[in-house]
């Protein structure tokens, strides 16, 4: 089953600021996650149904929530990992 991709407004604003190279890298990974959104090693502890995608070489992160009842992967936040700001924005 393929999930639908949605962005919360804040995440969409950040997404639009990304350069095309970073977007393409995230798109490739998001395409895989729409087929299989629950990757145990990428689950964020302390959050229910929230997972991350890491672009380690450039230090960017994307956090998303899986909503099974709606068959949706909702992007919650996108940004640089610096000082864990991206994770703090989830709280």
Regions found by a protein language model. Give the residues of each.
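A short, surface-exposed loop/turn module that caps and links secondary-structure elements
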Residues: 31-55
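Compact soluble domain cores
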Residues: 21-33
């Amino acid at each position: 089953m393929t999930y639908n991709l949605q962005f919360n407004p804040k995440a969409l604003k950040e997404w639009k600021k990304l350069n095309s190279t970073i977007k393409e890298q995230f798109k490739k990974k998001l395409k895989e996650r729409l087929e299989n959104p629950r990757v145990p090693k990428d689950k964020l502890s302390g959050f229910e149904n929230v997972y991350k995608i890491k672009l380690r070489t450039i230090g960017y992160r994307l956090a998303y929530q899986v909503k099974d009842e709606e068959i949706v992967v909702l992007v919650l936040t996108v940004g640089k990992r610096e000082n864990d700001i991206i994770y703090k924005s989830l709280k």
